[in-house]
């Protein structure tokens, strides 16, 4: 059960939670679309970043959507982006100039801006999902269960 009631506005359970204010829902959705479609960053890179952050933020709804990050560690751009995203999710105050130097080895300034904006937005979404208690049963697009994820954690 979520901590606040779902509104009548929005499509997904997440949207219904922020949909108590239609204007916020509308602008939130517009920003989400812009971040996913208005970028030259690879869609798989964005998805791996989203998955990485989901596990740090412990958002069940977000974790069961596609499971754990799944990429070849030789994919330097994805590896760099997910490492940065993980640090951001753990403690953004630890990020310093040297981390941006590492990002610059793989990304342009525009891409870094887009990546950081994406990470910030997704973090906000997932933290909201977590505090609202948006659990796995609300995720209609889940590909794995929390039970299965917990089993892989034990191995």
Language-model region placement:
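Hydrophobic alpha-helical segments
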Residues: 1-155
């Amino acid at each position: 059960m979520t901590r606040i009631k779902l509104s009548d506005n929005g499509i997904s359970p997440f949207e219904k939670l922020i949909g108590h204010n239609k204007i916020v829902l509308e602008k939130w959705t517009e920003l989400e679309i812009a971040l996913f479609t208005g970028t030259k960053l690879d869609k798989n890179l964005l998805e791996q970043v989203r998955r990485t952050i989901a596990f740090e933020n412990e958002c069940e709804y977000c974790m069961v959507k596609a499971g754990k990050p799944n990429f070849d560690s030789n994919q330097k751009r994805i590896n760099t982006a997910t490492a940065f995203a993980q640090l951001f999710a753990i403690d953004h105050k630890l990020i310093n100039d040297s981390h941006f130097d590492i990002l610059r080895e793989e990304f342009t300034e525009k891409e870094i801006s887009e990546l950081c904006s994406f990470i910030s937005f997704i973090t906000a979404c997932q933290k909201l999902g977590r505090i609202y208690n948006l659990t796995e049963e609300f995720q209609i697009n889940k590909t794995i269960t929390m039970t299965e994820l917990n089993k892989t954690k034990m191995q």
